[in-house]
Amino acid sequence: MDYNEQLKMKASQVKKLLDDVIRTDYEFEGIKASPDVTGYRNKMEYTFGDEFKDGPLALGLHKRSSMYDIVTCDGCLLVDEDYDRILNCVHEHMSRAGLPFFHKVTHKGYLRHLLVRKAVKTGDILIDLITTTQMEYSLDALADELKALDLKGHITGFLHTYNDSVADAIKNERTEIVLGQDFFYEELLGLTFRITPFSFFQTNSLGAEVLYSTAREYIGTTKDKTVFDLYSGTGTIAQLMAPVAKKVIGVEIVEEAVVAARENAAHNGLTQCEFIAGDVLKVIDDIKDKPDIIILDPPRDGIHPKALPKILSYGVDHIVYISCKASSLARDLVTIQDMGYSVEKACCVDMFPMTGNVETVVLLSHKKPDGHINVKVEFG
C-alpha cells in the first residue's frame, strides 16, 4: 500500500475511535509521518529454529500464527542492510557448526535468539547472541567473521547472554562481552541515552523525535512547574521536559528502566529529575510533590481503572496522554471526561510504517466553572 494511503487509513481509524467517545468539539490535527518509511527500526530480535519440523536451521521471525516455525527474513524492509548481513553471517556460521537450537517442547538445545541494535545517529551496533548453558562453544571465530563484514555502521560490542528459562523470551541471566563493550549512546533531541541490549527504548529513533516534539508542543511551557511523567519508561519524555521545569517526577514499574532513566539523567546533567520504581496505582499516594502538569504514556492496555481516578484527582489544568493503542485511549477518555476534563486537540504520529500500529497524542484540559452565583436565602 502506498505510504500516503497508509497514513490516511491510520488517521481515519483513530479519528473514528475518538469521535465516538469525545463529547465536545476538539481539533484533530491529522497524522505526522515517520521521517523514514523503510529501514527505520533500531532493534531486532531474531529466533533460532526451523522452518518446518526437523528442517535445517533457520534464524529469523516466527511465521504468522505459529509458535514453532521460523522464517529466515533477510530483506526485511523495516531494517537497513546491516541487519541482514549480520543475520546471514550468524546463520551461516551456526549452520556450519551444526549447533542445535533450543526446542520449546523438549527444552533441549543451545541456540535461542540473536538481538541486534543500531544507533541511528552514530551507526554504533550491538550484537547479542542468546543461548542456553547446555553446551560450551567458543565465539571467537564468529566475532572475527562479524568484524570482517562490510557494514555501513560499526560494531561497538558483541555479547553472549545465557538464558535457561523455558519461556520463549529473551531473559538476561548472565551476559559476557566477547568483543568491545555492552552499550552505545543514542542521540534524541539534543540529549544522549545509554542503550544496552536490554534497554527500553522506542524502536524508531527518528519517529520518536517527532512523537516527543509533539508531546512537548502540547505540554507547552514547563518553566517553574512540577511535571509528573507516569509510566515513564527510561525517562525520555521526562528528561526532555526537565531543562526548564522546576521538577520532573517519573514513575515506572520496570525497575531496570528506572535505573537506566537515572543514569541517563545524570549523564545529561539533569538534576531536577526524580525517578521512582513502582506501580503507579500504589506509588502515587506516597509522592509528596503535587503536579502542575501530568504526562501519561501507559502500556498498550491503557491505565488501570483504579489508578485513573487517583491520577485525575490532582485536578491539574492540563494532561497529555500518549497512546500506542487507540482503543485503550478511547476507553480511558470516557473516565477522564467523566472527571471534568475535555479534549482540546489530538494527532497521530506514525512510528511504525508498513504496519497497522500508530501513536496518538491527546491534550486534555480541566474544565473550570465559568463563574459563580451568589444566592441569598432568608428563613422566615
Which stretches of residues belong to each language-model region?
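Short edge beta-strands and adjacent turn/loop segments
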Residues: 108-121
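Nucleotide donor/acceptor-binding cores
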Residues: 42, 123-125, 224-225
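Extended interfacial segments that mediate partner engagement and assembly in macromolecular machines
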Residues: 1-103, 121, 135-136
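Short helix/loop segment immediately N-terminal to the Walker
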Residues: 101-108, 227
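Short, aliphatic-rich beta-strand segments
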Residues: 116, 123-132, 192-196
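Rossmann-like S-adenosyl-L-methionine
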Residues: 138-140, 144-380
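Short, acidic/hydrophobic/Gly-rich beta-strand patch recurrent on exposed beta strands
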Residues: 58-63, 128-130, 261
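Solvent-exposed residues in well-ordered beta-strands and their adjoining turns
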Residues: 47-49, 64, 117, 130-132, ...
